């Protein structure tokens, strides 16, 4: 087992009963009892701050607790009665209503391609259980190949997942290292659903450290408290505690992912893909395709992120980000154990990933950069492809043959298997090493997978592909993909901006300082026991109300460590992000998509007064600009995004370079703070 078991999380090792906003309660759901299910214990938010008029954070007094105890007692008695009565008489069959009992719904992706959708009548709840005993293992990522029989037009259902988070030792590339696993496997399971479905994820934390789960790119409209950001919307899930995430997927479709949002734990293994289908998916994707699959690329470290963070955040560290050891594709890589003397290593079960694609068809590949630091350049030898989706936004197809993708970004491409030179081709995923400021003698910057054409005459693979690399020079700069030609299929003209906000991102280094990242004059520190959301809800009205529609709240928050931009009403805001650092920053906004209005690699960015003129002079587009949730601002460059702040809650804007966000390059947007009835008298 991992040496993690001997380590204490000194920052957030509090148990649930010690945390003010995580409490345990027993679910005695009558429906579950009638279905023969045993009531389970889970941790939920106690009166979570549902962003509605009636919702506010409360803490029950003694009378409330007594009433709750009596209610739970009565529900338990009634539930037991229902359980006894639910057993059918001897020799009888279950009725149609019983056919979808709790036990019958416990299916895995492999058991049912439609994930529980069988017959004309759809179950109201689909359960996903994985019981993987024994040693930790690499996930069978065949589940990342999406089923062509998935019903995109089915009625909304509830999809309930059961995840056990635990520590374990695993060797994704041959080299063993401590990891954080979901259901004893790495990477995490695919979450696949339709727009309108309800997602429930029951998390049981058996790891030695606290954690959380963030569903990256999901709007969480009405469920801000399910955003999973430790220090902003929730306390971490303490060891030996449970927490249930529950939200409705609405107003979006496409490719997303989930990951830990506490410290740098995502790079320890706590991540996986999310695919949301729309009933209009085949219309929004203007090129048809025969198959559909997820391909996650990520940088991989053989040391734990706790060790790496200690070195990165040391005094006088000069912001030297930890350099990865090698890349992974869908959680797999290949290293030669002879290069790792003194390490526990076994590469006998490692192999290059193989993607079998039927010849003569189009195929959709959903690329996700799930890494901490490295930009990737991805190509398939001799195959151009069309980009058709960017961060969940369907776009008119545009041809490319190399894809630059930074951490947290997602792209769908359509590739046509119509090349006749051979049957096997390299899929190359290279880390752009120009971004690395230090040397790693064990660095392997490229990973290769094999794209294999399959047909009735396909023979076993006996040798590596001999395909040809693209001839032009490889980009060495850390630059975002040029997306100026990509325009959404669903045409949308951004509304005029109400406000203009200027942000400066930089690092304070030198003079034996800690390597801290800043937005303007603020460097963020996560408050694990008193998240920003709850501090705002508990603040007095004079500290949390606004006199103007938009302002920095420096009354309820210490702006030195909590840069909170607060709005009243729905506001459309231009945010000008100016990067004073030499490295690229992929900035991600929670809870929203933004319009990418302008970008520049030199000179001063336009101001509110000069933006329209700048767009006219530089052929800028404000008719139907790209909408996404993660934009890269290159070194000493700038970008202007326009965002409609109409999703009530507290949302982070941060660099998705893990090391930079952990150094403090985080700010928060407090949206529509006046509509929630916060300041009603508390019990």
Regions found by a protein language model. Give the residues of each.
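Extended terminal and domain-junction accessory segments
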Residues: 46-49, 53-152, 264, 268-311, ...
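N-terminal edge beta-strand
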Residues: 170-193, 342-356, 540-573
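Asparagine-centered strand-capping/turn motif at beta-strand->loop junctions
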Residues: 203-207, 367-371, 576-581
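Intrinsically disordered, low-complexity terminal tails of fungal membrane proteins
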Residues: 1-59
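Aromatic/His-enriched, Gly/Pro-containing loop or helix-boundary segments
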Residues: 182-192, 222-256, 261, 282-285, ...
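A cross-kingdom feature marking solvent-exposed beta-strand/loop segments within repeated
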Residues: 226-243, 351, 386-416, 556-561, ...
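Short tyrosine-centred short linear motifs in exposed loops/low-complexity segments
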Residues: 194-197, 241, 248-255, 360-361, ...
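Acidic-aromatic/histidine active-site loop/patch
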Residues: 291-362, 368-371, 508, 517-518
